[in-house]
């Protein structure tokens, strides 16, 4: 096997052209909105964080009523917490004792790995599996571009989603805010629809029809809210190509749910194994990649009654991030256990399977950390997020513990993919790291690929590729 591409192949900063350094000056980027969410959070105290279930609770609720409210607002674990609360122990000791017995059984089962994934879905656990770096504390938790016209949605740590166009500013951005929308993990604009966006959060799915009259300071209601079974939080979601089906995953559920919003129907894709953590629908609509909180991941065939192939990554890890090539023939992913970039190849509606070698998961790049300048600045290590540009020429990688962004050149052929390290991007300061990245869709075939970077400082940067 040929030697893997690695980060040591990149030239040091001192030899890079100006274009590959911290900024590139492209005239059309000057018309993009200037966004710094940290400044907006400080300047707009009205954009406070809302938490579901905190509004107007009667002080004289009985025990059973409190437990029922906890179940509908927070699911099983909130119910168990309420059953074991000091107030319940005082008013209904038998219920509290029953709660203790249930908690002891679940603790024993988890310790014996009888129910290894049965545990409370805390914000810390959600943060472990989302693609956003330092999700708990990051000013920006997610970015999503509209597929059909210039419109960028930015989800903040304050549970507010701000919608920016080319004419938007911090004071004129459309705002989506609701008590039913907390701990946002993902967002997606609906394909073939100009104004509908769905937001995945602790409470489930919030569907919004974006209206320019929605401004900061007003609390509004989503047009629809879909609750996940058992009131679990959404941790990943993806629309199919034509916007008729929405796939969702939760780290508390083994099933992938396929929603049909127009009919209100949902179909669970059930398999034994650990809960789902990450979904990626292929651009050609043929395949749905589904990672789990453990080594197992699956690739579902969307045209053969949801048949699936089961795969396993390296021991001790799970798939942290993945992305499809624009043509849909290649899938790249990285495990949390090792800094190696892997690929799977898809041709003619089936996984290559004529021989054992063809069906292997192939490593194509070594992402181990290395020093890049005289100051021994490190780049690389365990990957946080992958993003592939719409033209298929560049792959961008961010990392969990180092602050530079690695850029690889990619060369896609029908049956082969080649990759080589190109250069690095860095923030305005050495301490600034990328929280989330995504590419703007191509609105015209000859558009440049524009990478959108949410930095830990709260600012949004746009970087245009050739």
UniProtKB/Swiss-Prot annotation:
Keyword Transport annotated: yes
Q: What does this protein do?
A: Involved in mitotic spindle assembly.
Keywords from the named record: Cytoplasm, Cytoskeleton, mRNA transport, Nuclear pore complex, Nucleus, Protein transport, Repeat, Translocation, Transport, WD repeat
**Species, as recorded:** Drosophila melanogaster (Fruit fly)
What biological-process GO terms show up in the record? microtubule bundle formation; mitotic spindle assembly; mRNA transport; nucleocytoplasmic transport; positive regulation of protein localization to spindle pole body; protein transport
| UniProt protein name | Aladin
The protein's matches in Pfam families, at most eight in alphabetical order, are given as: Beta-prop_Aladin (PF25460)
Gene name of this polypeptide: Aladin
Task: Identify the domain of life.
Answer: Eukaryota
According to the entry, what is the taxonomic lineage of the organism? Eukaryota, Metazoa, Ecdysozoa, Arthropoda, Hexapoda
GO cellular component term of the entry, any? endomembrane system
The record's subcellular location field reads: Nucleus, Nuclear pore complex; Cytoplasm, Cytoskeleton, Spindle
Q: List the disulfide bonds.
A: none
**Start and stop residues of the WD repeats:** 135-174, 179-218, 229-269, 271-310, 378-418
